[in-house]
Design a protein with these regions (language model features):
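A generic structural motif
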Residues: 44-48, 78, 155-159
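N-terminal post-signal-peptidase region of extra-cytosolic proteins
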Residues: 47-64, 68-73, 89, 133
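Short N-terminal segments immediately surrounding and downstream of signal-peptide cleavage
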Residues: 26-45
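Generic short beta-strand segments
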Residues: 40-43, 72-75, 134-135, 154
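Extended lipid/amphipathic-ligand handling interfaces
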Residues: 92-96, 133-137, 178
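Short, small-residue-rich packing micro-motifs
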Residues: 67-129, 147-156
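C-terminal interaction modules
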Residues: 2-31, 51-57, 88, 142-145, ...
Length: 281
């Protein structure tokens, strides 16, 4: 059995949900198209053997077309099955076979897959995520990744490594190095993420707000029972470095809410950890 480095932190980040079931037919995926539904600053579409062009709302995005975002830029793509993908700053993304093969080459994305859709799979280097009927966030770079679930459940795994797979539930986050064995997920504060993430504050409602709010309320109830405890452990912006901060600074983060972030992009300006009460000493 592989040992896992278990942390009982709760960080305000969101992840995508996975539902178990057989894959839909190839024909079902091939009918799915994507369209640009929101553009913030510098976003380019790069087709196969074609020059880059500036993306505009209502542009059609075909499979194999790379979507690139610049510094402090974001974009939203909506597929014909109502699946929504939002990319943060400095991201590179493309897809094939509809939502069956979403490829995040670099950067961060939010993915919302409605229960009526066939589901989706995100590939990012040496890791992958299977999602059905949920809302998730994945940040990927060559040296680290960070995955959060906002509602539902998703599966994070490493293709080609039998058994290296974990279920990540709403309010949980997993992070690590892409080529290392997966670690057990930790808790994060959904409510704080929803208040501070540009994936949420810079866009129109996703359609899964009631589901995310329900999961946040569950966390609040667990806090009132002391099963979850707020900590002063914070991840600022992108990355996976956990910082120990003064409690007053955590309060200031809440007050800033969706204010300008020191690190442009779609991850929250800061994520605050929660501790599982039953594990607290």
């Amino acid at each position: 059995m592989n040992s896992r480095n278990v942390c009982s932190l709760v960080v305000s980040i969101n992840l995508v949900v996975f539902a178990v079931g057989g894959p839909p037919s190839v024909s079902a995926w091939q009918k799915i198209e994507a369209r640009v539904t929101r553009v913030i600053q510098d976003v380019q579409l790069v087709g196969t053997n074609a020059a880059a062009r500036i993306a505009a709302v209502n542009d059609s995005v075909s499979e194999g077309t790379k979507v690139r975002t610049g510094a402090d830029s974001r974009v939203e793509l909506t597929f014909s099955d109502k699946t929504v993908t939002r990319l943060g700053a400095n991201a590179v993304f493309d897809f094939r076979d509809g939502t069956r093969n979403l490829n995040l080459e670099d950067g961060a994305l939010l993915l919302r897959v409605p229960k009526s859709a066939n589901g989706a799979r995100i590939s990012a280097g040496a890791i992958a995520v299977a999602v059905t009927g949920t809302t998730v966030v994945l940040e990927y770079h060559a040296t680290y990744y960070k995955f959060l679930v906002l509602d539902g459940t998703a599966r994070l795994y490493r293709p080609g490594h039998l058994g290296d797979s974990i279920l990540v539930k709403a309010g949980q986050m997993a992070f690590g190095q892409p080529k290392a064995a997966l670690s057990d997920p930790v808790d994060f504060d959904i409510g704080r993420f929803l208040k501070t993430s540009r994936f949420i504050t810079d866009f129109s409602p996703l359609g899964s707000e009631s589901l995310m709010a329900s999961e946040s309320h569950k966390q609040q109830r667990e806090k009132s029972k002391k099963n979850l405890i707020d900590t002063n452990l914070v991840i600022f912006g992108g990355g996976t470095v956990v910082s120990l901060v003064d409690p007053a600074q955590v309060t200031a983060i809440d007050q800033e809410k969706a204010g300008p972030s020191a690190i442009p992009g779609s991850v929250p300006p800061a994520t605050t950890a929660l501790n599982s009460g039953e594990k607290a000493k």
